[in-house]
């Protein structure tokens, strides 16, 4: 990095926070010793869809959270610095990462020992080469439940397209990894019906979801409809009731020796079985999970671009071990 740019980078990154003494924290020392990291790589901020709950739509209540360059502007060969991580998992993220398939094909060989993951809206899945598909351990496809729910949120015909593309992964590409239905649960969802529908398709190994509540200046913006009178009403009458019914199904199946692939439940079950007190948030953001932005900065979470960068991959003295346990997330996430 030229000296002038290096000075700018040092101004952007809080080096005192990065280089703070972590020797006396046993949790931090354990993270450094294990050297296990989940690394998101945001390939673009662009997406070809206009989903109803996303900043690409016309809903004027949605805040503009895009704080980074729309496209990758750093030399992706710098990603090779993460080859020093002992146990590395890489997740391609966006925007829509499959709008930048050549970048994916360029990055995968740079990290020969990593495990790879993809989170995608599924539109361009069939543009991937089968040999690239088989490089992935996990593929998360955005689908919100049944056909009516998915098409309402993501556009007419999306549900049938996604089902077709997911079957293509299995049948044509011989993908044997973890295929996850990644829902955005919004005001039109009956969570019990949506999750049960996706599990019963026999296509997905797991179902995971995120609530559509944290991007709006008015949380009730999309929860006042024929189902509910605002978010709290929806949560109490529909969501919590559905979660309770899902848990009942989960327990009944456990008694029969079957574990339903409901991701939020599995994380909690693991904690109960291990009997460990959780001292960091479960997603690992800021402790052992990080994101390379399109600008080359490293922050703790790909869906929180407003958080200050922890480091910059372009710094000559970059050391991935300095990232561990740098950003202790609290507040809303905690």
Residue locations for each model-derived region?
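N-terminal accessory interaction module
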Residues: 1-12
